[in-house]
Amino acid sequence: MKIGVVLVLLTVFVVVMSSTSVSAQSDEDECLKETGQMQLNCFPYLTDNRIHTPSFACCSEVYTVGKTYVDCFCQFINNGGPSFGIVVSQKLLDLPELCGVYGACGNGKNFKNTSL
């Protein structure tokens, strides 16, 4: 039940973030929207110690954000998602590799191909 409430709040946050329409910040807004969706899809894996493998939906978002919004992706992987209650953990740091997205955030940001 508690996770249901959190997911509803996360959904509301993503909707609010995606409805922002300031043209000067469109890239930043899109990045926040994409990161929010990634956090939403990866939330169960990142917060439940009984889940040992991220879902396809989670990995799909990790791939998309990792390829399209590299700076934002690296910031999330290195700093967590405090607005979603996601803290830096080994699961978060392992997420790109588990989803087949390889690269060095902050060190060339060169992601290799994946097989999603």
Curated annotation (Swiss-Prot):
Disulfide bonds: 31-74, 42-58, 59-99
Keywords, sorted A to Z: Cell membrane, Disulfide bond, Glycoprotein, GPI-anchor, Lipoprotein, Membrane, Signal
GO cellular component: plasma membrane; side of membrane
Cleaved signal peptide residues: 1-24
Glycosylation sites recorded in the entry for this protein: 113
Taxonomy, superkingdom: Eukaryota
CDD domains the record matches: AAI_LTSS
PANTHER family: BIFUNCTIONAL INHIBITOR/LIPID-TRANSFER PROTEIN/SEED STORAGE 2S ALBUMIN SUPERFAMILY PROTEIN-RELATED (PTHR33044)
UniProt function note: Probable lipid transfer protein.
Family to which the UniProt record says this protein belongs: Belongs to the plant LTP family.
Protein name: Non-specific lipid transfer protein GPI-anchored 17
Annotated source species: Arabidopsis thaliana
Gene assigned in the entry: LTPG17
